[in-house]
Amino acid sequence: MRIKFPAGNYSLVGEPLTAEKPKAPFNRVAFAAAHVVADPFGNADPTGAPAVDWQRTLAYRTHLLDLGFGIAEAMDTSQRGMGLDWPTALELIRQSLDHAGSRAGQIYSGVGTDHLAAADARSIDDVVRAYHEQLHAVQKLGGRVILMASRALVRVANSPADYENVYARVLAEAEHPVVLHWLGEMFDPALKGYWGTENFPSAMETALQMIDANKAHVDGIKISLLDAHKEILMRRKLPGGVKMYTGDDFNYPDLIAGDHLGYSHALLGIFDAIAPVASAAFTALSRGEMNKYNALMAPTVPLSRLIFGAPTQFYKTGIVFLAWLNGHQDHFIMINSAQALRPLPYFIEVFKLADQAQLLRDPELAVLRMKQMLAIHGA
């Protein structure tokens, strides 16, 4: 099968991988951060509350759960803080938990301070109150928690001790151990200097001290710094029983596979896009079939590096584009009109790399939709 691109013809080479439900649990905890499907017929201004297609949004979560993944709900991949406001995020969490039924325990939801504009934060007490408001709301629904980084905390904190103070007070209210999230500035520039410094070793030590002081309330930490060395260094320093969840969408296969000193679990946005292949790879890893694991994962890395390439915060556009190509939604419209945040050559390369990674589940449909994308660009 061929498609004509502006730079020439491209012949598809990938054999679509059939998605199969795992027959046994993975030997790693694996969360997929899931995207939200916009309602293209909703009368929503891009600067206001988003219009969500709840049916398709929930169906995609079922797709991910069926492939063996937990769901990281209402996180960055869902455009949290970049189009998805807190009231809509809470409704998403409620509906997702209800829809999952007996599998609701596999859903961990983002708790942050995004309803408090950073410019309106005056003290760390303001930040603690904001965290508590969201924490209590999610726990009231019976939800487990991922404690997200706070733009407001960056604004008001004067020292690493302020971070330790805030996290200790918030974690004290957690009903179950939470997953912490250290999101790097490449994902959100407003988080530059998190933990009170731009020096990584110092920031890491502050985070480790906070975790050690509150480890009864901490299941693990996800770090999204796109640096394998930093993740491994911190992983080896974590207190016993506290998990490292890789958030590294550039280096995840090796970090998950691990070494003689340990391995990372996973909480990744790229799993939204590569779920069928990643699920098969986790099954192979669980069986000790390392050659198969590497053969499946390796072709997904160039795709992930492209999708998450700078400016990284716009990676959601590539994630949703693939969901559209694969027929999980009928349109390529995003909340906050984020479908416009990448250029045509990016989409062409995403198409090619997805094909090469066996991720176009219906090549004929994918080609048809890629042609539609080309047409609206005048190609």
What kind of region is each of these model predictions?
Residues 2-201, 337-341, 345, 357-379:
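Active-site beta->alpha loop and helix N-cap motifs at the rims of alpha/beta catalytic domains
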Residues 255-379:
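Structured C-terminal cap/extension of enzyme domains
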Residues 33-38, 67-73, 141-145, 206-210, ...:
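Short amphipathic alpha-helical segments, especially helix-boundary/capping motifs
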